[in-house]
């Protein structure tokens, strides 16, 4: 087993996760089996109870693990399925050690950070690195480990010490450290500064780790003189200094790394049995990145949510939309709309914000209402859903978005004016959305219906079923405490809102479709968590197809995107116009 540790310096949030994912992608393209581990130094057991403004979205894994969004990057880049134990937190490690102490496993010894916490970290990493994450269920050959935060943070010290010890246990030829640092460029001088990187590397060495590669992040391409300066003052060879500047898409990052000889370096440093030349997989990434930058046609989607001030709150939703847009040769224009700004109260308090929000909603080609919790902003979401339904605008509701679509339909089509979810009004006389008591025992963390669950289609005549390849069932990831009231579904179906999918017992309603509408769809699960760059999520793909007026043609062709089922470079005789009609006339 080979281990690659990715650490960060200067500041957090400079792209360690994308760089770690890109390194994994390059190694996978060389024919190696790669897994990934993310270490978060916070004391929380997992990310399940975080506000989205704290760390961005909560990513859900197949086994129900609620984890850091970086694990979503690993899954998308590497096309693997990780587990909750691939996300290590300080809380998990301390809980593990304290439980062992309570069971008497330490035989009365004083339990300390060194050696007990550090040993637990090493043991966890070695055990989890062996767990298969590919469909072939074979043991991985390389484990990429990202240490969250920055070197010098007090929270991360036990983990740094654990890896200082681990590098000797694993042996030099099996352990490699990549340090990601920022090279700022102050506007006052325009000069790229290396001092923060020098100090960061010095701090790393002072803690017992020495970088094998220094990845320098910058806004603009870094000059060769800067590379030589970092090489000299950080005591590494020039080829061990890698530059990654801001690029138009994250698909370009693996290519930048490969162009700077990282495959050759890993082959020598870790004695890997690989070729120096990139494989077909990396060539597909190159073609995909080139295609992304050449797209001319634009599809605009309005995302109506309550956490719109931070784009990371909807990271997987954005990626799922981007994957689908790229698959149909369109550039995505995602417009974030704060749902509270669509409400009547905003018109009174700030009419400019109100009209700007509605202007964005009206000009969008499609509307998406994602998941969320709490009553704030729900009336604005209901307004957006009502507008999409009445104006026949393509709409996708995910989790809470589906539940609110049911509430809106009940109020305006069934004339149940007090219809609501018991999450927002426990005493409503028309509880069209109810809680699931078996998933709400009292504690907040880990008490929802989580992870991969099977959804069975009820009917052959379903757009979603066709988008999923006419399968009898699908397996997607869930994260919810509330469900549509199954006792009232017949009232909706009589008026044209069809429940086309349910759980294996037939009790929980998981998919809705509205009759006589181009695309009005809701799903109780989160399909964005399973979307991949080369395998876009079907519900999101359907939204983009409907928004560009090509859904019917796609369905009539048997749900085939192009002559090639994976991303092929578009040549002169394989243009998007030939593969998709420009629009459908109504």
UniProtKB/Swiss-Prot annotation:
<dbReference type="GO" id="GO:0044210">
    <property type="term" value="P:'de novo' CTP biosynthetic process"/>
</dbReference>
<dbReference type="GO" id="GO:0005524">
    <property type="term" value="F:ATP binding"/>
</dbReference>
<dbReference type="Pfam" id="PF00117">
    <property type="entry name" value="GATase"/>
</dbReference>
<feature type="active site" description="For GATase activity">
    <location>
        <position position="528"/>
    </location>
</feature>
<feature type="active site" description="For GATase activity">
    <location>
        <position position="399"/>
    </location>
</feature>
<dbReference type="InterPro" id="IPR004468">
    <property type="entry name" value="CTP_synthase"/>
</dbReference>
<dbReference type="GO" id="GO:0005737">
    <property type="term" value="C:cytoplasm"/>
</dbReference>
<dbReference type="GO" id="GO:0042802">
    <property type="term" value="F:identical protein binding"/>
</dbReference>
<dbReference type="InterPro" id="IPR029062">
    <property type="entry name" value="Class_I_gatase-like"/>
</dbReference>
<feature type="region of interest" description="Disordered">
    <location>
        <begin position="562"/>
        <end position="586"/>
    </location>
</feature>
<keyword id="KW-0665">Pyrimidine biosynthesis</keyword>
<dbReference type="InterPro" id="IPR027417">
    <property type="entry name" value="P-loop_NTPase"/>
</dbReference>
<protein>
    <recommendedName>
        <fullName>CTP synthase 2</fullName>
        <ecNumber>6.3.4.2</ecNumber>
    </recommendedName>
</protein>
<keyword id="KW-0315">Glutamine amidotransferase</keyword>
<keyword id="KW-0067">ATP-binding</keyword>
<dbReference type="InterPro" id="IPR033828">
    <property type="entry name" value="GATase1_CTP_Synthase"/>
</dbReference>
<dbReference type="GO" id="GO:0097268">
    <property type="term" value="C:cytoophidium"/>
</dbReference>
<keyword id="KW-0436">Ligase</keyword>
<dbReference type="InterPro" id="IPR017456">
    <property type="entry name" value="CTP_synthase_N"/>
</dbReference>
<dbReference type="InterPro" id="IPR017926">
    <property type="entry name" value="GATASE"/>
</dbReference>
<comment type="pathway">
    <text>Pyrimidine metabolism; CTP biosynthesis via de novo pathway; CTP from UDP: step 2/2.</text>
</comment>
<dbReference type="GO" id="GO:0003883">
    <property type="term" value="F:CTP synthase activity"/>
</dbReference>
<feature type="compositionally biased region" description="Basic and acidic residues">
    <location>
        <begin position="575"/>
        <end position="586"/>
    </location>
</feature>
<feature type="domain" description="Glutamine amidotransferase type-1">
    <location>
        <begin position="300"/>
        <end position="554"/>
    </location>
</feature>
<comment type="function">
    <text>Catalyzes the ATP-dependent amination of UTP to CTP with either L-glutamine or ammonia as the source of nitrogen. Constitutes the rate-limiting enzyme in the synthesis of cytosine nucleotides.</text>
</comment>
<feature type="active site" description="For GATase activity">
    <location>
        <position position="526"/>
    </location>
</feature>
<dbReference type="GO" id="GO:0006241">
    <property type="term" value="P:CTP biosynthetic process"/>
</dbReference>
<comment type="similarity">
    <text>Belongs to the CTP synthase family.</text>
</comment>
<dbReference type="Pfam" id="PF06418">
    <property type="entry name" value="CTP_synth_N"/>
</dbReference>
<dbReference type="GO" id="GO:0019856">
    <property type="term" value="P:pyrimidine nucleobase biosynthetic process"/>
</dbReference>
<keyword id="KW-0547">Nucleotide-binding</keyword>
């Amino acid at each position: 087993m080979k281990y690659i540790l990715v650490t960060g310096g200067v500041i957090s949030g400079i792209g360690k996760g994308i760089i770690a994912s890109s390194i994994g992608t390059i190694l996978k393209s060389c024919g190696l089996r790669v897994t990934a581990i993310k270490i978060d130094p916070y004391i929380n057991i997992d990310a399940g109870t975080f506000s989205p403004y704290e760390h961005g979205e909560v990513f859900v894994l197949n086994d129900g693990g609620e984890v850091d969004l970086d694990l979503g990057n690993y899954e998308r880049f590497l096309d693997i399925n990780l587990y909750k134990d691939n996300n290590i937190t300080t809380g998990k490690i301390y809980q593990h050690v304290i439980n062992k102490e309570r069971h008497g496993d330490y035989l009365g010894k004083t339990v300390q950070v060194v050696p007990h916490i550090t040993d637990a970290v090493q043991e966890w990493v070695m055990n989890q690195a062996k767990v298969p994450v590919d469909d072939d269920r074979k043991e991985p050959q390389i484990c990429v480990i990202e240490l969250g935060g920055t070197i010098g943070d007090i929270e991360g010290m036990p983990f740094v010490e654990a890896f200082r010890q681990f590098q000797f246990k694993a042996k030099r030829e099996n352990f490699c450290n990549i340090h990601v640092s920022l090279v700022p460029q102050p506007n006052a001088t325009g000069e790229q500064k290396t001092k923060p990187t020098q100090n960061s590397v010095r701090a790393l060495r002072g803690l017992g780790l020495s970088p094998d590669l220094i990845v320098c992040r910058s806004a603009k391409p870094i000059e060769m003189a800067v590379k030589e300066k970092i090489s000299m003052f950080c005591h590494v060879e020039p080829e061990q200094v890698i530059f990654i500047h801001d690029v138009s898409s994250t698909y370009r990052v693996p290519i930048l790394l490969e162009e700077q000889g990282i495959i050759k370096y890993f082959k020598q440093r870790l004695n890997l049995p690989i070729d120096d030349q990139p494989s077909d997989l990396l060539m597909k990434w190159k073609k995909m990145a080139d295609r992304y930058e050449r797209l001319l046609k634009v599809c605009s989607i309005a995302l109506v949510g309550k956490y719109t001030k931070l784009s990371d709150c909807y990271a997987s939703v954005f990626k799922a939309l981007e994957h689908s847009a790229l698959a149909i040769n369109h550039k995505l224009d995602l417009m974030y709309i704060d749902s509270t700004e669509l409400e009547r109260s905003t018109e009174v308090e700030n009419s400019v914000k109100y009209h700007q929000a509605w202007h964005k909603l009206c000009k969008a080609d499609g509307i998406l209402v994602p998941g969320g919790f709490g009553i704030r902003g729900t009336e604005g979401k209901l307004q957006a859903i009502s507008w999409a339904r009445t104006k026949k605008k393509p709409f996708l509701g995910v989790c809470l978005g589906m539940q609110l679509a049911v509430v809106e339909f009940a109020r305006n089509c069934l004339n149940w004016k007090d219809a609501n979810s018991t999450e927002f009004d426990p005493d409503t006389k028309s509880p069209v959305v109810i809680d699931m008591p078996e998933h709400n025992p009292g504690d907040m963390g880990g008490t929802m219906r989580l992870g991969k669950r099977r959804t069975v289609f009820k009917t052959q005549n379903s757009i979603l079923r066709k988008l999923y390849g006419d399968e009898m069932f699908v397996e997607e990831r869930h994260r919810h405490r509330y469900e549509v009231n199954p006792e009232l579904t017949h009232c909706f179906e009589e008026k044209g809102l069809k429940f086309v999918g349910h759980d294996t017992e037939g009790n929980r309603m998981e998919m809705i479709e509205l009759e006589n509408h181009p695309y009005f769809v809701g799903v109780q699960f989160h399909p964005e968590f399973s979307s991949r760059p080369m395998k876009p999520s079907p519900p999101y793909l359907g939204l983009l197809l409907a928004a560009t007026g090509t859904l019917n043609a796609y369905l009539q062709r048997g749900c085939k995107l192009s002559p090639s089922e994976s991303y092929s470079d578009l040549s002169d005789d394989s243009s998007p116009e030939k593969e998709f009609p420009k629009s459908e006339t109504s």
